[in-house]
Amino acid sequence: MVGASANFDTMITPVVVDALRLRWFVPPEVGETVRWGLSWNVDSPRRWAVAEPAWVSTAEVRTSSKPLKWRLPRDGSDIREPVQPAIGRVGALQFMFDAEPPVPSRIDAAGALQLCAGTPRDGTNARQAWTDFDENASTTGVVRRLRLMSLESDMLPDPKFPHGPSWGWATRQFVPGSERFYELARAPRALRSYQLTDREWGPRREDFLLVDLETAS
């Protein structure tokens, strides 16, 4: 069960690895101890809800040493808002996320975490990932399970932005009910992404590596 394990001193967390990170970093193996840089964002419960619907973790929060960033607000206006890189921690599990000031003392993380930095293959992008990540936010854990997660996505109205019956923002989102899971003995060399129709910006199917990461609770 994700969030707990047979050993009550440990917990299992779902981690999503996309095609880009699988190219940048050495693929994980079951039973291997890894040191990873992980991230979470406020869209994770919606984006990765199918990965492990039951996974929720309350994390204590501290401010990262990384500088303040700016983003476009969710109401669709063009006035940028500040966000503070922050670190969530649950036992030995840590992850980075962007917090709206003031930085909260706790957050409820759900959906899944994402791999941002791992053991680099040859390449400047992989090494740069650790430069961009807060070194004090890394997590060391054991890989307990590997699965291939295949999801369909399409351009759909974005609930984060205002819209009407004939206008509004559309963003690429996962199609509910399209998910497929396959148990893996080892990680694939690459992950697929392919168009399902000839329509421009039409539906696509994309593969992800889903890792059960065990850490001390």
Segments (PLM) and residue ranges:
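Short, surface-exposed secondary-structure edge patches
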Residues: 19-28
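Short, Lys/Arg-enriched N-terminal segments with co-localized hydrophobic residues
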Residues: 2-10
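Long protein-protein interaction modules used by eukaryotic assembly/scaffold proteins
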Residues: 53-217
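Short, structured beta-strand/loop micro-motifs enriched in basic residues and often containing a Trp
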Residues: 9-20
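Short, Lys/Arg- and Gly-enriched loop/turn segments at beta-strand edges
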Residues: 40-55
